[in-house]
Amino acid sequence: MFVIIKSAKKTPAGVVGYWERDWDDQKVWEVGWSVLPDYQRQGIVTAATRLLIAFVTKLKSHRYIFSYPSINNNPSNAICRKLGFTLIGDRNFEYPPGKVLHCNIWRLDLLQIS
């Protein structure tokens, strides 16, 4: 996880992170983010995730990055769209434990990143 810092005051605005997971019998990256309400809708997460994608691409360890925002989380789905992810479906996930969350499945092919 990385803390997203806003401005020269070094104010934390949110977090963005990546981790390894299994998807259809292959290792992939999953990316996720959270931003504090005062910093939403400013492009901060899009910019931070773009930097994270560049970092992960250089690792050359997995072909895909996935993201699983709730189908009702329009801002997070828009971030995936802006960053070139492809919507490949939806699925129910248990998150947090004990709660079912209906999520979109977004995939970014790192081989297509120039």
Where are these regions (language model features)?
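Acyl-donor (CoA/ACP) binding surface of acyl/acetyltransferases
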Residues: M1-S114
